[in-house]
């Protein structure tokens, strides 16, 4: 879906869509991600350690997720949304909504 240095792009014909982001090896994948308005992003934790998803602008925030738990958020407005794992601050991601 994405290669190094390129954003993953959701299929624009499948609205509303759900796109999955994996939390694995202390990274979010794919990252960065570009989606159309109305897309739901579902983050799934595949690590043994807990992670969460916290946006810089506080528009979304998950609880701590154990392995195989997930969190979903539907992006209703265009913009760039940066997020982190609050317990692993070097774990960062970005969703661009077009």
Where are these regions (language model features)?
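Extracytoplasmic copper-binding redox domains, predominantly the cupredoxin/blue-copper superfamily
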Residues: 1-98
């Amino acid at each position: 879906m994405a290669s190094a240095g390129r954003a993953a792009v959701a299929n624009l014909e499948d609205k509303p869509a759900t796109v999955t982001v994996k939390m694995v090896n202390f990274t979010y994948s794919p990252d960065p991600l570009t989606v159309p308005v109305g897309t739901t992003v579902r983050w799934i934790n595949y690590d043994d350690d807990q992670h969460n998803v916290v946006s810089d602008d506080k528009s979304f925030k998950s609880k701590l997720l154990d392995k195989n738990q997930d969190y979903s958020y539907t992006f209703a407005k265009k913009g760039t949304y940066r997020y982190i794992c609050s317990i692993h601050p070097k774990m960062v991601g970005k969703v661009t909504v077009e």
